[in-house]
Structure formats: C-alpha cells, structure tokens
Amino acid sequence: MSNNWEMVIGLEVHAQLNTSSKLFSSSPNQFGSEPNENVNFIDSGMPGMLPVMNFTCIEMAIKTGFALNFNINKYSVFERKNYFYPDLPQGYQISQFEFPILTEGFINIDNEGIQKKIRIERAHLEQDAGKSIHDIDPKFSFIDLNRVGTPLLEIVSYPDLSSAEEVVSYMSSLRQVLMYIDVCDGNMQEGSLRADVNLSVRKKGEELGTRCEIKNLNSFKFIRQAIEYEFKRQIDVIESGGKIEQNTMLFDTSTGETRAMRSKEFSHDYRYFPDPDLLPVNLTQDQIDKVKTSVGELPQAKLDKFIKDYNVDKDIAKIITVEKQNAILFEKMISETDVKPKFIAAWLVGDIFAFIKENSLEVSSLNEKTKEITDLLKLVSDDVISNKAGKEILPKVLNGQGKPSDIVKELGLEQVSDSGELEKIIDEALIGEEENISKFQGGSDRVLGYFVGKCLKATKGKGNPKLINKILLERLKK
C-alpha cells in the first residue's frame, strides 16, 4: 500500500538558548526550579511592564547563522503573535514573522552513508510560553510560569525530508551543531530541544497534499513513532475515500498514536503586528563579524580533521565527534603524548567510554586526568604492559588510585620484552615438538597460536606476545 505513497516533511525545531536570563526580562533562565519561582512582573504580563531585549540572544542567533549557512539579516523585527491560552499571561507571544533574523540556510545530513542537503527557510527568535499541568488534581489545572519568556530560536526547514530516518538524522545533526557552538544544551528530555513535524502524503510525482502538524516531540524515538503512525493514518484516510483536514496533532506516547487537538491555524489567524514596545533590531557589520570569531570548529570540520590528519577510522571518528565534550577530551589527550591518535581513539570509544557510562560520569570529568590516561596508553603502546594489563589498570587510574607506572610495579604487570630471555623460553617450548613444527612448515598456521600460548604460559602471561610471535616465526622457518 505505502509503496505507492511518499511522505513530505518539514520541521519546526525549537531550541532553548543557553542564556542566564530570559529573552525580555532579568528572570533566571533555568530548568528544575520550584513552580513560579523564576517569574517577574514582565513574565506575568502585569500592566505597564515593558520588555527589555537580552542582546546575548541576538548574538546566539548570529552564531547559529554562521554555523547553519544562513543569511544574517541586519534588520529584523519583533512582532506580537496574538492568541489566548492560560499559560500565556500577556495574551500574545513576542516572536518574529515578516522580518526574521536568519533566512535561507542549510545543513548537510548523512543518512546511512547517503549525503543530502536540507534547506532551512528561516530561524527567528521568540519567547516560550508557560506550562499547563493537568495531572495533579482531577478538578483543577495548574499553571507554572517559569518557562514564560525563555528565549527560543525556532528553526524552520523546507519540506525536504522524506522519511523518519532522514528527520532523525536532521534533528541529530542540528542538535550536534547547536551544542558545539554552545547555543543550546540539546537536552531533549528537559524540553531544551523539541520539534513540530509537518507531514503530508502524496502519490509519487503528484502535488503536495494537505499537511498536519504534530506538536512538541522531544525524543528521537517519539519523532520516529509519530511519523510512522501519521504516515499510515493519512494514507488510510485517503484510500478509504476521506479527506485530510489541516489539523494540529498530539502524539500520545502511551498508545503510539496521533490524534487531532484542533484545526490548524493560518498565519493571519494570529493577527501579527510589530510590537510597539520593542524597537527593530539594526545590526552593524562589526557586530556580526565580532560574533563570527566565537563560532569555533564545527562538527564536520572536526570529523574531517580526525580522519585525514589523525588517521582515525571514520566510524570511530563519528563516535568521538557526536558530542563536543568527547572531541575536547580526545584533542587534549593527543596533545599530551606522542602515542598515535588512532591508538588513543580506539581506547577512548572502547574502555574509557565504557567506564564513563558504567559510573554515570560526565565526559568532561576526565579532562583533569588526561595525563594519567595517556601515560597508561604509552605503556601499552610501547609494549611495557600488555593490552589486557592496560584494561585491568585503567579503572584504577581513572579512580585516582595512583600513577600508571606505580600500579604496574605494585601488581607486577610489566611485560617480559627481553629478547634473550624470550629466546631461551621459546627454545625450551619447542623441545619435543617436532611433529607440530612439521605441521607448521607444512602450512598449518594454527600451530603458531598453540606455540604462542605455550610460551605465554611459561612466562605466566607476562611475555610480550608481539615479540614472542616474531621470534617464534624466525625459529619455525629455519
């Protein structure tokens, strides 16, 4: 059935900005406070209270403009978006409509090895609304105004997305960029980054269908589920002879289904007009250029550098660059040692990340321990200790139980790498093994593993396996 249909998707992503105060007031911009704790007269819509622009929000929008290839508009205007809801005490939302701060950007996504350019129509600043709470009392609803006035950057894509996988890839890439430039913390669980999905269906090659908007999706899992369900729902309606209504939809996470909340509004329903309490934003080129210097290295540039300059495998480099703190830790480690970056990268995404996960740590917590970590990796890389011994010592090093070299001595884990000593052990191991030696010389490579194991046993596991392997091959080929 769905083989004859295709989905067309555009996304409206709301990113809460990493500011200390709100967009138009001095109230703290922080998550997790007691209800209605971070509210002043401006936030609560008291008569006569005038908004004051937080210019840091403008700077963060400009930074996003550079990171996402936008045109940065020197002239932009804040307007009132008029609608009534209990958690919007002013009776309108201050947003940007006709003259947004950013227009015509794009981001490249990688969906299972397939590259695609996703165009972004616009990004504009606006204030968030409060929160209505309906599950405390069966008779009453409660309002928490802490979120009112929280600065949002709404990033609106063109309908260039055509699958749930592409949408998740787009959201993931967008989140990564915003976190790299320190504009948004990307915490979807707390609502710092959420998406409205505009989805329509059509037969392949036909005109665009009527779209429905699925509101406030705050996890990749829910985005995927909502898209897959809504795609099937719209096809079922059309194939049953029905017509898609332009509705605003809610995704029910308990049932995995979408349902209509209300008919979808058009822009003229909101009666936008310039906010008389706020002057237009007029930026100078100097202001824009000053922000550009703070953008820093973006994820794709870091990925390319790790692959080309440091010879790190692409899949491993992707894991390291997915979070900014991962990349910071990696670059700090390689700056403190002559161990090959590729070797460090393999340990980082393996045992080091495993330790971080098992102990519920922040990656940044290891930034003060990079010297100890790289000292340990140097011992492994130089064959002073085995890879197995390195894995045994790593948790002790990360828990601050001593220097790697001291722990090695204390536990007696230093490898036997003396060629003369190993030659004697190998010669003794080959005594009486004429039959197996003949098998090896006849082409049986498996016998080599048997001999290596025998020699390691003779050294109580402390023999350097690389050196044992080398000497054995020299002996067996004679």
Residue ranges and their predicted role:
Residues 445-478:
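Short, amphipathic C-terminal "tail helix"
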Residues 337, 344, 352-366, 371, ...:
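M16/insulysin-pitrilysin zinc metalloprotease superfamily fold
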Residues 64, 230, 347, 351-355, ...:
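Amphipathic alpha-helical segments in well-ordered regions
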Residues 288-294, 301, 332-339, 373-385:
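Extended, non-catalytic structural segments that build the interaction scaffolds
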Residues 1-297, 308, 314, 336-340:
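Basic, nucleic-acid-interacting segments
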Residues 3, 311, 335-344, 384, ...:
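Structural motif
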Residues 190-203, 308-331, 341-358, 371, ...:
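Core structural elements
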Residues 363-378, 387-457:
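Strongly charged, low-complexity linkers/loops
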